[in-house]
Design a protein with these regions (language model features):
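A solvent-exposed, acidic/Ser-Thr-rich amphipathic alpha-helical stretch
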Residues: 54-108, 112
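Exposed beta-sheet edge and beta->alpha loop/turn motif
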Residues: 117-146
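Hydrophobic pocket/interface hotspot
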Residues: 44, 55-57, 64, 81, ...
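A mature extracytoplasmic/lumenal domain signature
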Residues: 60, 70, 120-122, 145, ...
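Sec-dependent bacterial lipoprotein signal peptides
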Residues: 1-15
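A short, structured loop/turn motif at beta-sheet edges
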Residues: 107-114, 142-149
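Short, low-complexity N-terminal intrinsically disordered segments enriched in polar/charged residues
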Residues: 17-50
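Low-complexity, intrinsically disordered terminal/linker segments enriched in charged
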Residues: 150-171
Length: 171
C-alpha cells in the first residue's frame, strides 16, 4: 500500500510540474497563428512605406501569387510585384500608411484561419506635385509555415490612383 501511495504522489508531482503550453486552454490556435502572421504583415507594410524593397521582399515567399486590383489584370509573381513596386516608388515620396489588421476567416466555417486581412489608408506626395489624396485599400494575406506571404489579394481604386498620379501639378 505504501508503494502505491508513493507512486501516486510522484505521479501527482510530475503532473503538477509540467510546463504550461504556449496556448491556454480554450484559446483558438488559429488566433495565435494570426497574431504571429500579423507581425510579419505589419513589418512588410513598414518596409514598404520606407521604400525598402529588399526588406519588403524578405516577407514574401518566392512562390507568392499576387492577385491585383486591376480590371482584367493577371496574377503576378514575386519578381513582377517587386518591379511594379519599384515603378510605384518613382512616382511618390513620403509614403505613410495607417494599417488595421484583422484575422482572416475560413470561407466555410467563418472562423479564424490564421490569415491576415488589412484595411489600409495610404498617403504620399506625388513627384509631379499632384493633389494629395488618401487611398483606401483592402488586402488579404495567406502565410505559409515559415510566416511568409504566399497569397496576396488587393482591392483599391487603381484607375482613380493613376488619375491622381498623372494629374497636372497642384497650384
Amino acid at each position: 500500500m505504501k508503494n502505491i501511495l508513493v507512486s501516486i504522489l510522484v505521479l501527482a508531482s510530475m503532473i503538477a510540474c509540467t510546463s504550461k503550453q504556449t496556448t491556454t486552454e480554450g484559446e483558438d490556435p488559429n488566433m495565435v497563428l494570426f497574431r504571429e502572421n500579423s507581425k510579419v504583415v505589419e513589418a512588410a507594410f513598414k518596409a514598404f512605406s520606407k521604400k525598402d524593397l529588399k526588406e519588403f521582399a524578405t516577407y514574401q515567399a518566392d512562390s507568392i501569387k499576387v492577385h491585383g486590383a486591376q480590371f482584367g489584370g493577371k496574377d503576378i509573381n514575386k519578381a513582377e510585384m517587386l518591379e511594379r513596386s519599384a515603378i510605384f516608388f518613382k512616382l511618390i515620396n513620403n509614403v505613410n500608411v495607417k494599417v488595421t489588421l484583422l484575422p482572416g476567416v475560413d470561407e466555410v466555417t467563418l472562423k479564424p484561419d490564421g490569415s491576415v486581412r488589412a484595411y489600409v489608408i495610404w498617403s504620399a506626395d506625388f513627384v509631379n506635385n499632384a493633389p494629395k489624396t488618401d487611398l483606401k485599400s483592402y488586402f488579404s494575406f495567406k502565410l505559409d509555415k515559415d510566416h511568409k506571404v504566399y497569397d496576396h489579394d488587393e482591392y483599391y481604386d487603381v484607375s482613380g490612383w493613376f488619375q491622381v498620379a498623372s494629374a497636372a501639378p497642384a497650384k
